[in-house]
Amino acid sequence: MVTNDSLLSRLLPGLLVAAAIFAAWWLFIRAGDHPSVPNQAPGLLDAPSSVGPMLLQASQLGPTYDQSAQDTRATTSVEIRKGQSPAATKIIAHTWKAGARAGWSQVHGSITVLSRAELFTGSDLNAVSAGFERQMIHTYHGKPATAPGPLPGQHGWLLQGTTVSQIYSTLYTARRQVAVYGWQHGDVLAIVVVTGLPRDGVLQAATTLANAQDQNIGFVTRG
């Protein structure tokens, strides 16, 4: 005859397994919907910002791109002055208000995008824009490029180059094509940087995205 203690010792492992399964099921139900990709960490565009709406937005990049929390942030006062001439530094000191950038990368592709905007209180910004252009030439070994279509803004400059940055080579091939377009829209300086493989057509992508961002800037400044 089986004693109560013996019966309990036989049933206990099964009861523990059943309890664990029930707990896991309950947590799953309480969690609700489970997207196939992790939720993006909050970044600059999730908080109120005078410059954030001037950047490219998620709806313009589409669902095939993920936003980088690391590359989506406000511009610091040190960054805005880096590599600038004394004349440009003076303009920045007196008229720069705020800046921001947003980074993106294809989930199942090779393109990365950086969208940047800097807001000033004046429109005499040629010296500052020239400083940005010099930085891009140095960073990407850039050379003037011919636009494949209409480009927005005033005093624009279009560069094509390459990068061997470790930021990209950890994910993609070490040598990548780069297209950079910088322009002025009133009291805003904007830059779009697109990197990719030869098949990606980075010049065309940069042209298309620059026009999209310029529409955002126009909408914000008119509002």
Where are these regions (language model features)?
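Hydrophobic membrane-insertion alpha-helices, especially the h-region
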Residues: 12-30
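A short acidic-to-branched-hydrophobic micro-motif
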Residues: 93-131
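Short, solvent-exposed aromatic-acidic interface loops
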Residues: 132-136, 195-198
